[in-house]
Swiss-Prot record:
Gene Ontology annotations for the cellular component aspect, listed alphabetically: extracellular region
Function comment: May be involved in the regulation of feeding, neuroendocrine system, memory, learning and in the afferent pain pathway.
Matching InterPro entries: Neuropept_B_pre (IPR013298), Neuropept_BW_pre (IPR013297)
Gene from which the chain derives: NPB
Residues making up the propeptide: 56-122
Main location class: secreted
GO molecular function: G protein-coupled receptor binding
PANTHER family (alphabetical): NEUROPEPTIDE B
Species of provenance: Bos taurus (Bovine)
GO biological processes: feeding behavior; G protein-coupled receptor signaling pathway; neuropeptide signaling pathway
Protein family membership: Belongs to the neuropeptide B/W family.
6'-bromotryptophan modifications at: W25
Keywords in alphabetical order: Bromination, Cleavage on pair of basic residues, Neuropeptide, Secreted, Signal
Protein name: Neuropeptide B
Any one Pfam family match given in the protein's UniProt record, by short name: NPBW
Amino acid sequence: MAGPAMLVAAALALCLLLASPGLAWYKPTAGQGYYSVGRAAGLLSGFHRSPYARRSEPRGGTRSLGGVGTFREMRPNLRSLAVCVEEVTPNLQSCEPLPDGRATFQCKADVFLSLSASDCRK
């Protein structure tokens, strides 16, 4: 005669085999399909833009007076230019410690940029 433990195990196995499968215990959310972890997450998983970021320039018939309309027309061209940092001169008198508890300071600086590709050095 089989022991009571063997009968209970057989009955449990039979119930599990005959029962219909239930819902999945884990369903991924409908949100983002990637999770950024650590500092190199953008390099490892590619660059992902926010779905709320503006993808193109707004189209509108409103034009500002003065030279602002000319600047808006030039702006797509400025995005394709190479920007090179020529020189950074920090103003040490403006440095203030940040309240993060580490030895981190915030300083003002003069930054000289160049829009010429010939000025870019590697």
